[in-house]
Curated annotation (Swiss-Prot):
Enzyme category, top tier: transferase
Record GO terms (molecular function): ATP binding; protein serine kinase activity; protein serine/threonine kinase activity
Enzyme active site: D183
Keywords of this entry: ATP-binding, Kinase, Nucleotide-binding, Repeat, Serine/threonine-protein kinase, Transferase
All copies of domain Protein kinase, residue ranges: 62-330
Protein's name in the database: Serine/threonine-protein kinase SBK2
UniProt keyword Ubl conjugation, yes or no: no
C-alpha cells in the first residue's frame, strides 16, 4: 500500500478566523492553539531526548530474535536485553534515509501519548549508532491487521467491531493531545493475539499537530479524505484536523466488513465507485445501495455515511461509532443475497457495475 506523500508546515493562528469555513472543516482558533501547544511540547521533548540518546551499537545491548516488520524507512525487530532477557520491539531507522530530527519527532510523538490500551507503548530509550537511530517499544507479536483481512470477505463481524472500537478509542486519545494521526491503514495496526481480540496502533511518523498546513504531493489512496484532493484553501495548504482520521476510520471499517476498498481514489472524475457512493449517500435511500455495500446493515450505512461525509465539518468524529457497537453491521444471512438478486433484476445498477469493472479488494 503506497503511503501518502505530503508537505507540511506549522500554521499561524492569525491566518484563520474563529469558526473556519467549509474548506477548513470548522477548525477554530482554540483548536489551532491546541495544536500549537502540542507542537511546542514536542519541540521541548525532542530537545531533551537529543541530549539523552544512548551512543552505542544496538547489538552491544540487545540480541536480535527475529524481524517483526519492514517498511520503506526502516525495520522493526524483536530483541531481548542481553543482561535481563526482557523481550522488546526495536525500531531501527538508517541514517542514510532518516534525519536526527525526523527520528526524534517520531520517537517523541510516541512518548507523548503515554499509555493507552490500543496504542503501542513507547519506552524512553533512544539509541544512536554509527549507521542508524533506534527506539524501543512493547513487542506485539502477531503481525499487522492486513494479514487478517480476507480479500472480498473481511473479518467476522465481532472482530470487526472490536477492532473499530479500539482504534476509535486510540484516535480519540491522539486527538485529545492536539494531534492528528494521518496514517490509519491496516498495515499500521498491530494484532496482539491470533483471534484478533486486541489491536494496537503504531507508527507515528506522519502524525502532526492539529492545524499544521498540509499539501498532498502524491496521488491519493482510498484512505485520503477528499478535502486533501481539492485545491487548498490557503496557498500553503490545508490546516489538518481530526476529521481526516474520521474519514480514514470509515474506509477501514468498510474494509474490515467487506474485504474490499470502497474506491481506489476519492475523486468523482476518475473513480465511478466513489461517484456512486456520493450519489447514494445524497439520496438517503438504503435500497439504492451500490455493490458491495449491499452486504452491510442499515446501522452500518448510517455509521459510515457519518464518518465518510465529504464535507469535513459535517463529518462525524471517530467516537461516533460508540452508538453503533452491539448493533448488526452486516445483513443477516440470506438478506444480502436477496438484495443482490433484487439489484441484478433491476438491471440498471447491475449494468453500471458491469461497466465499471471489479471493486478493488483489500
Amino acid at each position: 500500500m503506497p503511503g501518502k506523500q505530503s508537505e507540511d508546515k506549522p500554521m499561524e493562528v492569525s491566518t484563520v478566523e474563529d469558526g473556519g469555513d467549509e474548506g477548513l472543516g470548522g477548525l477554530t482558533v482554540e483548536e489551532l492553539q491546541q495544536g500549537q501547544e502540542a507542537a511546542l511540547a514536542l519541540e521541548d521533548m525532542m530537545a531533551l531526548s537529543a541530549q539523552t540518546l544512548v551512543q552505542t551499537e544496538v547489538e552491544e545491548l540487545y540480541e536480535e530474535v527475529r524481524p517483526l516488520g519492514q517498511g520503506r524507512f526502516g525495520r522493526v525487530l524483536l530483541v531481548t536485553h542481553r543482561q535481563k532477557g526482557t523481550p522488546l520491539a526495536l525500531k531501527q531507522l538508517p541514517k542514510q534515509s532518516t534525519s536526527l530530527r525526523g527520528f526524534l519527532y517520531e520517537f517523541c510523538v510516541g512518548l507523548s501519548l503515554g499509555t493507552h490500551s490500543a496504542i503501542v507503548t513507547a519506552y524512553g530509550i533512544g539509541i544512536e549508532s554509527a549507521n542508524s537511530y533506534s527506539f524501543l517499544t512493547e513487542p506485539v507479536l502477531h503481525g499487522d491487521l492486513i494479514t487478517f483481512i480476507q480479500p472480498k470477505v473481511g473479518l467476522p463481524q465481532p472482530a470487526a467491531q472490536r477492532c473499530a472500537a479500539q482504534l476509535a478509542s486510540a484516535l480519540e486519545h491522539i486527538h485529545s493531545h492536539g494531534l492528528v494521526y494521518r496514517d490509519l491503514k491496516p498495515e499500521n495496526v498491530l494484532v496482539c493475539d491470533p483471534a484478533c481480540q486486541r489491536v494496537k496502533l503504531t507508527d507515528f511518523g506522519h502524525t502532526r499537530p492539529r492545524g499544521t498546513l498540509l499539501r498532498l504531493t502524491g496521488p491519493p489512496i482510498p484512505y485520503t479524505a477528499p478535502e486533501l484532493c481539492a485545491p487548498p484553501p490557503l496557498p500553503e495548504g490545508l490546516p489538518i484536523q481530526p476529521s481526516l482520521d474520521a474519514w480514514a476510520l470509515g474506509v477501514l471499517i468498510f474494509c474490515l466488513l467487506t474485504g474490499y476498498f470502497p474506491w481506489d481514489q476519492p475523486l468523482v472524475e476518475v473513480d465511478p465507485f466513489f461517484e456512486d457512493f456520493l450519489i447514494w449517500q445524497a439520496s438517503g435511500q438504503p435500497q439504492d445501495r451500490p455493490q458491495p455495500w449491499y452486504s452491510l446493515s442499515p446501522a452500518a450505512d448510517t455509521l459510515l455515511w457519518g464518518l465518510l461525509d465529504p464535507h469535513p465539518r459535517k463529518r462525524n468524529p471517530v467516537g461516533s461509532i460508540k452508538s453503533y457497537l452491539g448493533q448488526p453491521w452486516k445483513q443477516r444471512e440470506g438478506e444480502a443475497e436477496e438484495l443482490a438478486t433484487e439489484l441484478r433484476e433491476d438491471g440498471w445498477r447491475g449494468g453500471q457495475e458491469a461497466a465499471k469493472g471489479e471493486q478493488p479488494a483489500c
